Amino acid sequence: EPPIEDFDITLLGTDESFNGDVIARKVLESEAILVASPEYLRRRGAPQQPQDLMQHDCLRLKMPHMRPRMWQMWCPDNPTQPIEIDIQPVLLANHTDSLLRAALDGAGITSVAMDMVAPYLTRGELVRVLAPWITGRLSMYAAVPTRKFMPQRTRVFLDFLIEETRLQTAKALQACATC
């Protein structure tokens, strides 16, 4: 974990809970969905069920705590029971923007936070794959060193950050009503 006490605000991205001793406010919550370019889907066809991903070009985020050759997926009908799909990624990257760019270029199917990809879906540059399945829930928290002595400028910025993020996320998702 980053040295939270060294900064006024530390942004922590997580797909799980974190240390309960951390003083933090949730800034953002999103679901990760699978997307591909229309060109890729014309060329390879769209998967009809999660197991079909084994036959597709998958673009996968590589993180220390993740198994890169497997996607966990949840269906809204059974949100507590994920399924695990073995995949053979054609691209492993440690940066979401690289995977998004590769998907836009027709390289394959990737998992991206819904609010991040909503503008591309709205413009038709990407298409959601295997809806309503999701590949995870992501949260971002703003951690502060202490609640007692938070400077007013920090409190004002934190309130602004949370409200602006909420508005931008709502705007992105509203623009993409079919997400």
Residues covered by each model-derived region:
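Alpha-helical segments flanking ligand/cofactor-binding loops in enzyme cores
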Residues: 25, 51, 100-101, 155
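C-terminal effector-binding regulatory domain of bacterial HTH transcription factors
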Residues: 114-119, 123, 133-179
